[in-house]
């Protein structure tokens, strides 16, 4: 059960990193709320 929240946090970090890369590709600071 302790590893569950850790995995969720890691997924969120990877998600924002991917969104960051998308932002740079689009050339704008508009981030999707998803």
From Swiss-Prot:
<feature type="compositionally biased region" description="Basic residues">
    <location>
        <begin position="1"/>
        <end position="10"/>
    </location>
</feature>
<dbReference type="GO" id="GO:0030435">
    <property type="term" value="P:sporulation resulting in formation of a cellular spore"/>
</dbReference>
<dbReference type="InterPro" id="IPR048194">
    <property type="entry name" value="SspM"/>
</dbReference>
<feature type="compositionally biased region" description="Basic and acidic residues">
    <location>
        <begin position="12"/>
        <end position="26"/>
    </location>
</feature>
<feature type="region of interest" description="Disordered">
    <location>
        <begin position="1"/>
        <end position="34"/>
    </location>
</feature>
<keyword id="KW-0749">Sporulation</keyword>
<protein>
    <recommendedName>
        <fullName>Small, acid-soluble spore protein M</fullName>
    </recommendedName>
</protein>
């Amino acid at each position: 059960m302790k590893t569950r929240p850790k995995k969720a946090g890691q997924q969120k970090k990877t998600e924002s990193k991917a969104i960051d890369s998308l932002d740079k590709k689009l050339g704008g600071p508009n981030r999707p709320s998803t």
